[in-house]
UniProtKB/Swiss-Prot annotation:
Predominant location category: cytoplasm
GO cellular component: cytoplasm; membrane
EC annotation from Swiss-Prot or TrEMBL: 2.3.1.129
Family indicated by similarity: Belongs to the transferase hexapeptide repeat family. LpxA subfamily.
Cited function: Involved in the biosynthesis of lipid A, a phosphorylated glycolipid that anchors the lipopolysaccharide to the outer membrane of the cell.
Keywords of this entry: Acyltransferase, Cytoplasm, Lipid A biosynthesis, Lipid biosynthesis, Lipid metabolism, Repeat, Transferase
Keyword tRNA-binding belongs to the record: no
Pathway stated in the Swiss-Prot or TrEMBL entry: Glycolipid biosynthesis; lipid IV(A) biosynthesis; lipid IV(A) from (3R)-3-hydroxytetradecanoyl-[acyl-carrier-protein] and UDP-N-acetyl-alpha-D-glucosamine: step 1/6
Pfam families per UniProt: Acetyltransf_11 (PF13720), Hexapep (PF00132)
Extent of the signal sequence: none
Record protein name field: Acyl-[acyl-carrier-protein]--UDP-N-acetylglucosamine O-acyltransferase
Length: 264
């Protein structure tokens, strides 16, 4: 049975799952779905369009699924999706999508620490850790198992590949490919592989060595990027990791450039 504090304001059209806990003074609009066994702390606002999964933990001051901060937004119906078992800490703000994609997505098993903001149409994968006060502009894409350090500022449309780590207090408008560490106060730069993260996730020494060799060609050979990628296609066994790296570089959009070598 769900437990809803008498001071909470729940829209008559909201769908509340089994064994949900909702704290004092929380407000939930009509067009909202809350999954089973999710716990919502006091003083949370969940606006129309939110689709929250099961076993999430939403802490005080969080504001979810409010209108996108986009001058082109004209009130069209859009949504925010949050997967299962995601923890949303104090004062996190997640805007719903615009007509560009119709939705903002935050996956499952994520930790969004206090004061994180994800703008409209962002897509955040699974098993992602985003530290305090990280700010994502609209349309960002974050792969699975990414870690973003506190106070980082991520420009709109930036993509961060799987298993990457972005350093704290960094900011950038460049795409960050999978498996790497990136940082920099003016522009993201390549700072080596996320070796500790890869080992924790079960990557073998051979896999890590291959990934390192690929990025040496891409970032440290002195070749133009197009020539470096061709060398990787020609000279390396096309393992899943190599294919993922090449696929990431092949799928860039919006004229977005990739992070720079650390010595540039």
């Amino acid at each position: 049975m769900s437990s809803i504090h008498p001071t909470a304001v729940i829209g008559s059209g909201a769908t509340i799952g089994e064994d949900v806990q909702i704290g004092p003074y929380t407000v939930i609009d009509d067009d909202v779905v809350i999954g089973d066994r999710t716990v919502i702390a006091p003083h949370v606002y969940i606006a129309d369009g939110a689709r929250i999964g099961s076993e999430c933990r939403i802490h005080s001051g969080a504001v979810l699924s409010t209108a996108p901060q986009d001058l082109k937004y004209a009130g069209e119906k859009t949504e925010l999706y949050v997967g299962d078992r995601t923890v949303i800490r104090e004062c996190v703000t997640l805007n719903r999508g615009t007509k560009a994609s119709g939705k903002t997505v935050v996956g499952s098993d994520n930790l969004l620490m206090a004061y994180v903001h994800a703008g409209h149409d962002c897509v955040i994968g699974n098993h992602v850790v985003i530290a305090n006060s990280v700010q994502f502009g609209g349309h960002c894409e974050v792969g699975d198992y990414v870690v973003v350090g506190g106070l980082a500022g991520i420009h709109q449309f930036v993509r961060i590949g799987r298993y990457a780590m972005v350093g704290g207090i960094s900011r950038g408008a460049l795409d960050v490919p999978p498996f790497v560490m990136a940082g920099g106060h003016n522009s993201f730069r390549y700072e080596g592989l996320n070796v500790i993260g890869l080992k924790r996730r079960g990557f073998t020494s051979e896999q890590i060595s291959t990934i390192r060799d690929v990025y040496r060609v891409i970032f440290q050979s002195g070749l133009l990027l197009s020539n470096a990628l061709e060398a990787v296609r020609r000279d390396f066994e096309q393992t899943p990791e190599v294919k993922e790296i090449l696929g990431f570089f092949a799928s860039g959009a919006h004229g977005r450039k990739f992070l720079k070598p650390f010595n540039s």
